[in-house]
Amino acid sequence: PVTQQWETSDEYLSGNVREKLATAETFAANHAEYQINVDYLKRVQPKDLDASEIEVRLGANWVKPEYITQFMREVFKTPNYYARIDIKATYSEISGAWNISGKSLDRGNPLVTNTYGTMRVNAYKLLEDALNLRDTKIYDTIHDADGDHRVLNKQETMLAQQAQESIREAFKQWIFKDLDRREDLCATYNRIFNAIRPREYDGSHIRFEGMTPEISLMPHQKNAVAHILYGNNTLLAHCVGAGKTFQMIAAGMESRRLGLSQKNLYV
C-alpha cells in the first residue's frame, strides 16, 4: 500500500514484516482490499522471543530511562526526598549519552558509598559510566617541581570496577523481575530487533526462453536464478554437485535477455 506498486510475494513478505503489518492494518481499517495483505503478513511474523532469550545490558538505548531510575531507587534505596525529582536517569538521542542527575546528593547511603560504590566514586557515578559503556578509572593528582600530574590509582580503580561489576550483575538480576516491565521490554525488543524476515526467492515463474529442452532446472536452481536477478548481490553457497554452473549460466542469459546486464562476470 505504501509504494502503490506490484511486488512479488517473496519480496513483500520479507524485510521488516512487523512494520509492514502495522502499515497494512492501518490501510485495511479503511480499505478492505488490503485485508489480504494483513492476513499473509500475519503468517510470516517472526516468533516472539521471551525473556530467557533476551539479554538486556546496561547502556542499551532501547531501555526506557525510567527503568534505569527505577533500578537506582530500588537497588540503591534512594531516599524519597531525593528520588522524587533530584536523582534520575535521562538519555539524549542526539548525543547518545546517558546522564544521572544529582549524583552527589545521596552521600550518607552505605549502599551508594560501600556496597555498590567506593569512598572515591559513588554508585550513581559508576552506574552512569556503565550506561555510557565506560570502565571507571580513578586518578590522583601529584604535585612536583614540574607541576601537577594525574596518575592512575590502580588500587582505587580496581575497587571501583569491582563495584561497577556488582551494579551490572544486580541489574541483570533485577531487570526481568517485575512482570509488567518484563512484558514491556520483551515487546520492545521484538518490535525493534526481531522484526526482519529474510527474503526467500521464488523462481518458479521464470520460463528461460531459448534454453534447450534437454535442460530442466530443479526448484532450488530456479530460486537461485531469481536471487541473482532480483537480489543484485548473491553468494551461491551450494555444495559440489548442486548445479551452480547451470545456475550461473541461466542467470546470465536471462539477465541479458531482460536487459539487466550486457557482460556478466562471476567471481
Predicted regions span which residues?
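Charged, low-complexity intrinsically disordered regions
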Residues: 1-195
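ASCE P-loop NTPase motor core, strongest for the SF2 helicase catalytic module
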Residues: 191-267
